Design a protein with these regions (language model features):
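Structural and coupling elements of P-loop NTPases
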Residues: 1-718
């Protein structure tokens, strides 16, 4: 197998809603390039993609699969991505290293919610797409309706390059209006017969050819002038115009296929080779310094790691794209994150689980290596002489949160390690032990996402665990000024303890004026003026301002750190529910000492109890985390979705309709979002999706606070 240069490589990403035939199309592409001599199928569990046991069980893609094929003396790297939005992290990784998306549509369904979701990701990641109406051999295939739905919903203008002569189970021919030929397929082996367009189809073909010509001319002034001058464009001119339109992400060429029968696959691959942007024409990668990294084969090597995997008997497999230069077996690179050197002992091209040894990979190519030390997804490997770091993948925020509980006592530590290892392969999984909540919290893209992870862990590691409702990281604060004093006094034998602290607390807010001539609540005309100030950004959010207004030596300065420590300890376990307290100003204005018995522990305990008493008298409030939620839903289901959100104490921030879908924005308490993905799927027959991002902390309603206080009291009594 030859080493391919950047001009001989195309990197494509297969995207589309679940069930659009991406894996079957990838299989047909590998067959056409003779990487395999027989096409596998989903039903028989022998495709290059979907090659894991769990994918065989579910009969769907769960992980992205990297494969390649050789065609027209070019190398086509293919990344087959899952259609389910629960596994969208794979698409973000794939589009980081892929230059163009091949966007599949089910000929029976056309544009679906899954299509809308993946189109949004393609727009977000600024990738051009080629449209493929697949499964035209299905019983209810309707090419015209599918294209019309694409036209109605897509922000990128579709243009027909091919249309079927017949469709449904009899589908075996299409007309290519770029080449102005008809192609007919007799067997399911990809062999085609090129024919002239039948007379009864000629008018339609010519009309669509004219639309294609006009679309190509729109994207280039020279082509537009040529079109006005000659009234048409050559095939090469059309390709040139489509190249420009694709690069601008303004046009989506539409093709006809049946991946299952290998109809139209070869022609699609020809178009990708001839028209789709490759490493030299696609936008350059950016470094973390904002500099462009061109695909220059002569420059010092740079490779970007977009996928990490652990395989039994092999260990860690690192998938990367060579961004610049070339990498050969034995090349020594530096991991720019860790500073450690990594030696690439072996190089492979990838075809699913099959790995083909390479001696060298050049700029623009994709491959893998094994047994690197501490390299993971989003790392850059670079020549030590020019250690540039590639801008990392920004993965989507988690949308599902649960607590983890091992079924067998004693499995907690092992389970924690296994869950943390899962993050190595899937960066959209977040796992942490919350000291605050005393739970192991796992976050992912949806309930299905985490259930798949659990199934895999149970089978591979023989560990069983449950997902349970996670506790909510509430916060406590105050709403008014309060004063308290507390004397800690203890006598034990010869040694005693004595410390008395008087304090004022009030709510803190950004930009509030400094305290001057501070009137002490409940102390008549008593006024204090703070002398010193300390300000702390709290690890859990918010601030603490700590002032000393001590005069006349009532409390030695050496005891002030102990007083601060006592306050911080109580803020670490708030007086109401044990949640963190935040956004408070404390002024220590008086106190008493004993010449013998006063010590740090005495003042710490006095401050702790004075703070607790003052807090309870300062209009204490519980605050809850609020999330911005965006729901994308077909218009027919909007009423049910909105009603459900309002039952979750949501505040509707806005709605807008967009090409058959409604986008609803709301702020929702985190406490109301547990298992929301499951409810949303049930309400909309699986046709909606949502995203969520932390917004702020807000006070809970009075009835909710009463319930939380009662629950905490009941737990405390137990």
């Amino acid at each position: 197998m030859k080493n391919y240069s950047a001009k001989e490589i195309k990197n494509i990403v297969l995207i589309g809603a679940p069930g659009t035939g991406k894996t079957t199309l990838a299989e047909a592409m590998a067959f056409e390039g003779k990487v395999i001599d027989r096409r596998g199928s989903i039903e028989t569990n022998n495709t290059l993609s979907d090659n894991t046991d769990i994918e065989h069980e579910y009969k769907r893609s769960i992980y992205s699969t990297i494969l390649f094929t050789e065609f027209m003396d070019r190398k086509l790297n293919i990344i087959d991505c899952p259609g389910s939005d629960d596994f969208c992290g794979s698409l973000f990784s794939a589009f980081k290293v892929g230059d163009v998306g091949v966007f599949l549509f089910n000929a029976q369904n056309g544009w679906e919610v899954g299509s809308e979701i993946q189109a949004r990701y393609a727009r977000l990641l600024q990738k051009p797409v080629i449209g493929v109406v697949n499964q035209l051999d299905a019983d209810k295939a309707n090419f015209e309706a599918a294209v019309e739905s694409i036209r109605a919903s897509s922000r990128v203008k579709p243009v027909i390059v091919q249309y079927p002569v017949n469709q449904g189970p009899e589908f075996n021919a299409f007309i290519d209006v770029l080449l102005m030929k008809m192609y007919r397929f007799k067997d399911n082996d990809g062999h085609r017969e090129e024919l002239e367009i039948p007379a009864e189809e000629l008018d339609k073909a010519q009309e669509l050819n004219k639309e294609l010509v006009e679309m190509a001319a729109e994207h280039d002034e020279a082509l537009m002038e040529l079109y006005f001058d000659k009234g048409t464009l050559t095939q090469d001119d059309i390709r040139a115009g489509l190249k420009i339109g694709l690069s601008k992400r303004e046009v989506m060429p539409i093709f006809c296929t049946s991946g299952k029968r290998d109809i139209g696959i070869k022609r699609l691959m020809e178009f990708i080779i001839n028209v789709a942007p490759g490493p030299l024409k696609a936008p350059n990668f950016l470094s973390t310094d904002g500099e462009e990294i061109a695909a220059d084969e002569t420059a010092p090597a740079v490779a970007f790691v977009f996928k990490s995997q652990v395989e039994q008997h092999i260990g860690e497999i690192t998938y990367f794209r060579v961004i610049r230069g070339r990498i050969a077996e034995g090349t020594e690179l530096v991991n720019t994150r860790t500073g450690n050197k990594e030696k690439v002992s072996q190089l492979f091209a990838v075809a699913g689980r099959n790995r083909i040894k390479f001696t060298e990979l050049m700029a623009g190519d994709i491959g893998c290596t094994v047994k690197l030390k501490g390299t993971r997804t989003n790392d850059t490997l670079a020549a030590p002489s020019a250690p540039v770091t590639v801008e990392p993948i920004v993965f989507p925020e988690p949308r599902y949160r649960a607590a983890v509980k091992a079924k067998e006592q004693g499995d907690e530590e092992k389970l924690g390690k296994v869950l943390n290892d899962a993050k190595f392969e899937d960066p959209t999984i977040l796992v942490e032990y919350s000291k605050e909540l005393k739970q192991t919290i796992i976050q992912g893209q949806g309930e299905h996402h985490l259930n798949i992870l659990r199934t895999r862990i149970e089978k591979e590691n023989r560990l069983q665990y449950d997902y349970i409702a996670p506790k909510i990281p509430y916060r406590e604060t105050i709403t008014k000024v309060a004063q308290a004093d507390y004397r800690h006094k203890k006598q034990s034998g010869c040694a005693g303890q004595f410390g008395e602290v008087h304090m004022i607390i009030e709510p803190y807010y950004e930009g509030m004026p400094e305290p001057k001539n501070y009137k002490v609540p409940g102390k008549g005309d008593m006024v204090v003026n703070p002398k010193t100030k300390e300000e702390y950004d709290l690890p859990w959010g918010g601030k603490l301002q700590f002032y000393s207004a001590i005069v006349g030596g009532a409390i030695d300065a050496r005891f002030m750190p102990a007083i601060l420590k006592g306050i911080m300890e109580k803020m670490d376990e708030g007086p109401l529910t044990g949640s963190y307290a935040r956004d408070i100003r404390v002024v220590i204005y008086d106190g008493k000492m004993h010449p013998v018995d006063s010590n740090e522990i005495s003042f710490k305990l006095a401050a702790r109890n004075a703070f607790k008493e003052a807090f309870r008298n300062a209009g204490p409030k519980i605050m809850e985390p609020i999330y911005n939620v965006e729901v994308l839903v077909p218009s027919d289901y909007m009423g049910a979705v909105m009603s459900d959100l309002q039952n979750r104490r949501a505040m509707i921030a806005g709605m807008e309709s967009d090409k058959g879908f409604d986008r609803l924005n709301a702020t929702v308490p985190l406490a109301e979002l547990y298992r929301y993905s499951t409810t949303l799927s049930s309400l909309t027959s699986g046709s909606a999706t949502y995203s969520m991002k932390f917004s702020s902390y807000e006070q809970v309603p009075a009835d909710v606070q009463d319930k939380l206080l009662k629950a905490y009291t009941d737990t405390d009594e137990e």
